[in-house]
């Protein structure tokens, strides 16, 4: 039981963070495809972007508690590049900073044109994907042979696409309540969710098979 409690913050970090990241990936896909979102829809979308950001902030707090003493979090700078856990947190912090900057710039009305908004949201989504890969690599520990494979990363990416797309799709549909998402944008959101579910199932099945060997 003590071991479960000790690892709970890390599990919460990975789960909550992946959902927040996936929401930004879903929003980027919709923004890139849907070039005709009205000003009112964009304003609502920018306000609701606070939801995945809150997810990410909560996840980061969980990560700090996994360190044992949150006050020692500043010491992670000494292990950048040598500790998978540190690399994971640093990559996530970079993503979160970019996401917050994007959100604030959008709220200020500086991303009304489709081009700059699509590029900026794409950068945030790419940083999120890198962060998810780092999360998966943090679990690939030589001391635990079952985890020491790329399939853990596959699981994280699948969970990110599935959970994040559900959150991002909900936010997008709340933003464009007068006119539903264009068919192509809505189709891509659904495709991302199905792809995420498939990837998650494959990753889980392979790891389960490894356990049985």
Functional labels for PLM-detected ranges:
Residues 1-45, 50-58:
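N-terminal signal-anchor module of multipass membrane proteins
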């Amino acid at each position: 039981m003590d071991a479960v409690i000790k690892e709970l913050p890390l599990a919460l970090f990975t789960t909550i963070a992946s959902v927040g990241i996936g929401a930004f990936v879903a929003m980027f896909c919709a923004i890139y495809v849907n070039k005709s979102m009205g000003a009112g829809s964009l304003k609502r979308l920018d306000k609701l972007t606070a939801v995945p950001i809150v997810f990410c902030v909560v996840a980061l707090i969980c990560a700090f508690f996994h360190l044992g003493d949150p006050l020692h979090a500043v010491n992670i700078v000494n292990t950048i590049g040598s500790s998978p856990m540190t690399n994971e947190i640093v990559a996530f912090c970079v993503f979160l900073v970019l996401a917050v900057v994007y959100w604030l710039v959008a709220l200020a009305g500086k991303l009304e044109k489709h081009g700059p908004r699509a590029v900026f949201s794409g950068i945030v989504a790419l940083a999120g994907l890198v962060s998810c890969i780092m999360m998966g690599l943090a679990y690939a520990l030589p001391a635990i042979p079952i985890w020491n494979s790329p399939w853990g990363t596959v699981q994280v990416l699948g969970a990110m696409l599935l959970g994040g797309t559900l959150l991002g799709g909900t936010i997008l549909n709340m933003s464009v309540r007068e006119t539903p998402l264009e068919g192509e944008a809505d189709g891509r959101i659904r495709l991302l969710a199905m792809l995420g579910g498939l990837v998650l199932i494959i990753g889980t099945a392979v790891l389960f098979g490894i356990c049985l060997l």
